[in-house]
Amino acid sequence: MAARWSSENVVVEFRDAQATAMSVDCLGQHAVLSGRRFLYIVNLDAPNEGHRKISRQSKWDIGAVQWNPHDSYAYYFAASSNQRVDLYKWKEGNGEVCTSLQGHTRVISDLDWSVFEPDLLVTSSVDTYIYIWDIKDTRKPTVSLSAVAGASQVKWNKKNANCLATSHDGDVRIWDKRKPSTAVEYLAAHLSKIHGLDWHPDNEYTLATSSQDNSVRFWDYRQPRKYLNILPCQVPVWKARYTPFSNGLVTVMVPQLRRENSLLLWNVFDLNTPVHTFVGHDDVVLEFQWRKQKEGSKDYQLVTWSRDQTLRMWRIDSQLQRLCANDILDGVDDLIDGISLLPEPDKALQPQDSEPQHSSGHGDEEALKEDFLNDLLVGKKTDQLGLPQTLQQEFSLINVQIRNVNVEMDAVNRSCTVSVHCGNHRVRMLVMFPVQYPNNAAPSFQFINPTSITASMKAKLLKILKDTSLQKVKRNQSCLEPCLRQLVSWLESVVNQEDSTSSNPYALPNSVTTPLPTFARVSNAYGSYQDSNIPFPRTSGARFCGAGYLVYFTRPMTMHRAVSPTEPTPRSLSALSAYHSGLITPMKIRTETPGNLRLYSGSPTRSEKEQVSISSFYYKERKSRRWKSKREGTDANNRPIKAAGKVIIQDISCLLPVHKLLGELYILNVNNIQETCQKNAASAMAVGRRDLVQVWSLAMVATDLCLGPKSDPDLEIPWAQHPFGRQLLESLLAHYSQLHDVQTLAMLCSVFEAQSRLQGCPNSYGPFPQRASNLASHSRYPSFTSSGSCSSMSDPGLGTGGWSIANKDTEQTSTPWCESSPDEFRYSNLMYPDHREREKDQHEKNKRLLDPANTQQFDDFKKCYGEILYRWGLREKRAEVLKFVSSPPDPHKGIEFGVYCSHCRSEARGTQCAICKGFTFQCAICHVAVRGSSNFCLTCGHGGHTSHMMEWFRTQEVCPTGCGCHCLLESTF
């Protein structure tokens, strides 16, 4: 068919618009052009008679604009600008912004109104989120969809109210808004970015994609691995959209090197040559949309907007529309007009499951016409795909030369009888085909007499036939001939198994092992979207173990990659669908026989089918004739097969700063710190750690009893404030933090914690745990999470979120003796009304060699070392270290009432006082400590058990303590 071309019918120029997007309303009356400063509303009935403007204040261009497609909301349109979508209302010649939708964090790439629900709008963005908005409640999106990559296109399905599609670079995801957690299907559509996406107006499963890779592809998302058809082009395709009539498609190309900027009209059933060319634009066509058909007219109008700042309208007459129709539908109108004159069909030719025609009224006549038209359309589409149109055609195409098989076919009753005779076994089976076959409807199989196989063999055979038929009908393919071949192959395998057993009289009967079929079995192919969250299997890897071992595995010598080593390994199993669909060089799948049903076999063989499996990604077929002849002459069952690579466990304890032997030799004698330091120094000398010998020698000197602090702060400065006190210890901890020696860190912290307890220093966690947590946040050892996995046998309650090892300078950050900051002074004044109490508390902190501000970090050292000891099996040593882990109170969360202890009058939280350990309050009626549910008056502070208070105030109005407070009235807000 020769390509036709035409010029436009209406041309309107807008030189000052500088518009980047255009949209036509559902009534066909107005078009909106989106510029940076103004939105131009054009009356399409009189485009040359001036236009209206809506001013906008934004430095961002409009990326997408679209009118609401419903007549009742025809005056609404949405426009996206950077991260925001503005909803405009155009009514009676005036336009204004109604509201804005704000939720995306990156630029919005596309938007689309729902065809079924006028209030729903979907937006896509580079921030990887797709939001569905309800314009009646614009505070937040009603549905949120999340993908790995940013979305460039989003379109609602035109036949399914819950379905929508998004494009992400070269991929397409199909979503169901009722299941927002994951996509329904995944299409590896193109190798380059997708510029256009459009659903078929009549088929809910079909869509078209246009891409930078110079092609338009047609998809049925129920068959995601192979496109239905492809339109190859010489240049990238900017847009491709279906026409509202017949089976047309309009494409806009991205011009290269000053080529013509024309639109092309195609017939989707004949993509060899465009049926029409729209010539006229001088620059890139940015947008095109269809205008609603006028009443009483069969013509359509195509409205286009180009970068040359011209709006053009093209008339599509009935002659052009017929060019997009199928050849088989030429003259269908005449056939439909005379269809009522057709004679009544012979009842003997009707299938049994057809419904009789009870009347010849107008409704039945219309239904018959519609069925006739649908049959023509379906028949034409089926011919295009090269598939059988009817069950009778499938029967005629079956290869009746299959050995040992006799098939009696009955197309009228939609059934066939299969007879197979192999060896001593005979199988006769009735196959019934449903009306929907093969459209995702599998046939049924039933054994009939005479059938000689056992009941267990019948069950196995039925399972094989059902699996084979389901696999085919899911792709809308015929399954009769594949089922027949499976039936014959299975019977032959049973006969061969029996012959091999009878030929060896000394063979023992095997009642446990089920004989495997001898027919070729193809390993599973992967690549569906359900596999997108499954990582691609590793063939090599390494992992450090917390017990001082490195575990690694390698690829066996027989395994080679079938693609170039420079090609990246797929990140997930779903990526293999690209290989399957032919987008990337396909790989041969190996055929597995019963002798080598393994994932990684040492002797792959050839197959005629090109599918993708995990193993085929790594196998490379060898073409050496010498190797091939040697392989054919060797029995696969007798040749040793290396199923996988080696797993190697390497001892790397010599590379680590921690030593298992030191963990066994170290001691923690809380009654004699000097002896502990001395023996630990000897243990370090035994393993060759001379640096630790010096460390433990310094620790022994620092913990000498003669350096113990005095109880009176006025007598002398504590040794901890000496340069060789806390400052020296902090420098040691900082040094071994840089070396990641958690063993030394934990042991030093435990020893000096034990020394502080012997000196009678209080726990760093006092009655105000908030203070300790605030100080700990300024520790010089900022925490990081350890990546080592914990043993499943360890106590989860003692696990740590990580211990901190950082490269920090060792300047002194502890508070000098008898010095405090203004904040600390104000805080201490709130805590201690008497300055002597404050000075005493400060002295208790200054006596400690370990800075109380870092107590939480020191606990992390001990917990981490405790996990290492657990992995070494030194559980008693672990218990000794964990004894020195402090037990701070739970951090305060939320809002609760403060309580003064009834005994010591100090502030307390909870039912027990942290100072005097007594119960904080008593019931005003029973004078027993309150531990459970309680009620108190916010005015007088009195109260007690809830049950007692309720019983009291049923008859009384004043407080039970006699304070005179009317608690019920005072507590009413």
UniProtKB/Swiss-Prot annotation:
CC per GO annotation: GATOR2 complex; lysosomal membrane; Seh1-associated complex; vacuolar membrane
Compositionally biased tracts (Polar residues): 351-360
Gene Ontology terms describing biological process: cellular response to amino acid starvation; cellular response to nutrient levels; positive regulation of TORC1 signaling
Chief place where the protein resides: membrane
GO molecular function terms listed in the Swiss-Prot or TrEMBL record: signaling adaptor activity; zinc ion binding
A Pfam family the protein falls into: WD40
Binding site for Zn(2+) 1: C901, C904, C913, C916
Highest taxon of the lineage: Eukaryota
InterPro entries given in the database record: RWD_dom, UBQ-conjugating_enzyme/RWD, WD40/YVTN_repeat-like_dom_sf, WD40_repeat_CS, WD40_repeat_dom_sf, WD40_rpt, WDR59-like, WDR59_mRING-H2-C3H3C2
Zinc finger residue extent: RING-type: 921-970
Annotated Zn(2+) 3 binding sites: C937, C965, C967
Domain RWD: start-end pairs: 393-494
Job of this protein: As a component of the GATOR2 complex, functions as an activator of the amino acid-sensing branch of the mTORC1 signaling pathway. The GATOR2 complex indirectly activates mTORC1 through the inhibition of the GATOR1 subcomplex. GATOR2 probably acts as an E3 ubiquitin-protein ligase toward GATOR1. In the presence of abundant amino acids, the GATOR2 complex mediates ubiquitination of the NPRL2 core component of the GATOR1 complex, leading to GATOR1 inactivation. In the absence of amino acids, GATOR2 is inhibited, activating the GATOR1 complex.
Subunit structure: Component of the GATOR2 subcomplex, composed of MIOS, SEC13, SEH1L, WDR24 and WDR59. The GATOR2 complex interacts with CASTOR1 and CASTOR2; the interaction is negatively regulated by arginine. The GATOR2 complex interacts with SESN1, SESN2 and SESN3; the interaction is negatively regulated by amino acids. Interacts with DDB1-CUL4A/B E3 ligase complexes.
Similarity remark: Belongs to the WD repeat WDR59 family.
Name of the protein: GATOR2 complex protein WDR59
Species this protein is from: Gallus gallus
